């Protein structure tokens, strides 16, 4: 299960997070404090940005009903020591999970889980490709719903559902986003009303999750999981020399024949804000117009966004 907040009425979280914190984390903290997340066994929090680092401690002291397992991912991924370090981080997480569940992860189970997740990645990548060929059916809201649903299903069950959707799409005649997420649905409705279709995305909440498989060999389960992190690319939360994300987006635009790029800038998201000038510069040099929109799941007024999207759509 993935925690991406929601339209929470921020009250209790104000005691733990400042108003300029990421709205997703504000909502997650509020839901943890007000009991919405009660029933969860444990929460794993990766310390990938300043707000997430604060969340590890805020959750530990504020949400006592739900244990928290922190994990710090290495950013100097070229160093051999980074692999060993990440394995040790995973081992600590497993100890916390064993304390909560009463069972230690078995190597055989971990290997099988990796296979299940890799199969799910492949199904989701195929869906993203097929969706671009059926934009009359897979509207922005439908596409988002399919992608987001993966966070709330057992992966094996969700894989089967996606495979069935893919098979149905294949029977039909064939007639890009970047950022963290593109919610709530009002934003997707605005895009659809302005005849903007999504042919690809680079959202953390969506396709970025399925871009990199865990290696099928190369050691035990934990080592292979660590190698998967080392193999990730094109994400603002991962350090990469030379800022290659722009060229990656250009290649995506060319492959999917995109007309432009909408940058979904999560409010108060420092890692995304650091990346934005670089990839927008590269995209504009390549001839792709860019529109940067602020994503705030707590917002309820979208008139200004509607005007900006209308103006952007008139470019094409």
Which residue stretches match the model-derived regions?
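A charged, amphipathic alpha-helical module
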Residues: 91, 95-213, 238
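Trp/Phe/Arg-rich N-terminal binding region typifying the photolyase-homology
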Residues: 1-109, 204-205, 209-316
């Amino acid at each position: 299960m993935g925690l991406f907040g929601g339209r929470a009425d921020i009250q209790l979280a104000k005691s733990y997070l400042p108003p300029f914190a990421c709205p997703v984390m504000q909502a997650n903290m509020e839901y943890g404090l007000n009991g919405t997340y009660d029933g969860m066994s444990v929460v794993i929090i990766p310390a990938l940005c300043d707000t997430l680092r604060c969340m590890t401690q805020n959750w530990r002291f504020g949400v006592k009903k739900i244990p928290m397992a922190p994990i710090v991912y290495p950013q100097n991924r070229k160093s051999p020591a980074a692999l060993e370090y990440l394995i040790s981080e995973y081992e600590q997480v497993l100890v916390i999970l064993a304390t909560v569940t009463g069972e230690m992860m078995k190597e055989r189970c971990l290997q099988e889980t990796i296979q299940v997740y890799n199969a799910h990645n492949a199904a989701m990548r195929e869906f993203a490709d097929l969706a671009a060929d059926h934009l009359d059916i897979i509207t922005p809201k439908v596409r988002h719903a399919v992608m987001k649903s993966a966070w709330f299903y057992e992966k094996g069950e969700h894989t089967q559902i996606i495979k069935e959707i893919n098979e149905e799409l294949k029977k039909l005649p064939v007639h890009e986003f970047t950022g963290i997420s593109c919610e709530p649905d009002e934003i997707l409705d605005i895009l659809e009303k302005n005849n903007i279709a999504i042919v690809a995305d680079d959202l953390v909440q969506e396709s970025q999750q399925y871009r990199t498989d865990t290696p099928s060999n190369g050691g035990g389960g934990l080592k292979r999981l660590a190698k998967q992190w080392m193999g990730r690319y094109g994400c603002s939360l991962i350090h990469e020399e030379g800022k290659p994300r722009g060229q990656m987006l250009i290649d995506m635009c060319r492959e999917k024949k995109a007309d432009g790029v909408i940058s979904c800038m999560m409010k108060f998201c420092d890692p995304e804000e650091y990346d934005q000038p670089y990839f927008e510069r590269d995209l504009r040099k390549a001839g792709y117009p860019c529109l940067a929109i602020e994503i705030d799941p707590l917002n309820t007024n979208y008139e200004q966004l509607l005007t900006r999207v209308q103006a952007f759509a008139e470019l094409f």
